[in-house]
């Protein structure tokens, strides 16, 4: 089992200068550099910041952020190539996901989540819908999708079931295995998803 946490893409934004210049040039070609990407929104709902307004990014045009995405893609490619080189790719379950939506309304608002609403720290789709890509050779069909909500706690019971293992007798798992969805079960339904997030107003 390998758990690889990339710091990309996260603040502070920083990337190799050649990559940043590549996306600065792309933004200029697309005339995105002529658009003010961040607009002032409503006042912060939290009392201690009531004198400030949310700064919301409405255009995806941050060259350093884009450079970080490309760099992360390159690094993940190295991992996948290593699996191929080791001859274990066909027997390895690979999961790529994130812990939250893009940071679109705070800390410099480096990214835009359109057409989804809001971003990290919000209960709307921009904050709760993240990439969740799974490759399980012989089980998953490339290009298929699942519309049933999946959450982070679901990963552990899914890994157990995929490996043919049971949870320890004393172990409680909050999540639900989504292996049936990976096998193409269109009727997979995990029921409602509820959680409490005491981080009011994104601050």
Predicted regions and their residues:
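Short, intrinsically disordered, charge-balanced linker/junction segments flanking boundaries
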Residues: 82, 183-203
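Generic alpha-helical structural context detector
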Residues: 134, 157-161, 179-183
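Conserved small-domain helix->loop->beta segment predominantly found in fold-type I
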Residues: 170-173, 181, 185
């Amino acid at each position: 089992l390998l758990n690889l946490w990339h710091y990309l893409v996260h603040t502070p934004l920083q990337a190799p200068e050649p990559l940043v210049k590549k996306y600065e040039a792309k933004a200029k070609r697309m005339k995105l550099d002529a658009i003010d990407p961040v607009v002032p929104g409503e006042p912060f709902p939290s009392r201690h910041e009531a004198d400030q307004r949310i700064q919301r990014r409405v255009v995806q045009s941050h060259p350093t952020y884009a450079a970080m995405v490309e760099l992360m893609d390159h690094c993940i490619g190295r991992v996948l190539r290593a699996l191929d080189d080791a001859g274990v790719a066909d027997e390895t379950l690979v999961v790529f996901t994130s812990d939250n939506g893009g940071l679109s309304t705070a800390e410099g608002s480096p990214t835009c989540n359109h057409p989804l609403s809001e971003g990290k720290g919000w209960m709307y789709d921009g904050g709760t819908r993240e990439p969740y890509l799974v490759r399980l050779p012989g089980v998953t069909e490339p290009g298929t999708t699942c519309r049933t909500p999946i959450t982070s706690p679901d990963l552990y019971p899914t890994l157990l079931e995929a490996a043919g293992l049971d949870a320890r007798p004393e172990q409680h798992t909050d999540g639900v295995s989504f292996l049936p969805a990976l096998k193409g079960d269109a009727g997979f339904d995990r029921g409602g998803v509820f959680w409490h997030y005491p981080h009011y107003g994104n601050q």
